[in-house]
């Protein structure tokens, strides 16, 4: 067992512990592998981690992320409900995210989002999230003469979390690229749960779209 601590937000350290058990058979595939149990407050996640010099994998993670842990990640007023993680797996190498799958469930509740000196309230519906790795086109790389010798456009992948209602109605999308930039799109269906919101449009239409560094989320 080992203890860990990170500063997820200024002056708000998050601490916990991790238990691991080596799985030496992963060495046959050129990777170190271990089963892990990660705890922080009431958060408890179990899965398998594999890695080498150029890639890492987090496989078959299950458990829950508790409200007290979420409160250390973001400076928002949060619902008193854990996020349940089911069969979540992610693989990443130098080219980006290669594969991702799994789901999450959140019962929702009252959320307060501070911005511009004000706190905006929204009553989050019950949400489901599905994880995938989606391709994103990257501009071809030119050589010293300004000529691209390849006829193929380079491809990268982003980690995609699609948020829906339990009835599979779209609420929003989060895309995280290999440079830790996050793209957020939120729909009319989600935003109309905010009392101060007066926007109009089709429920599936995107009404908020932002791109920012992952490290600035929740500050």
Model-based region annotation:
Residues 2-88:
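N-terminal beta-strand/beta-hairpin edge segment
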Residues 97-141:
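Short helix-loop boundary/capping segments
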Residues 75-113:
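Hydrophobic, aromatic-enriched interface-forming segments
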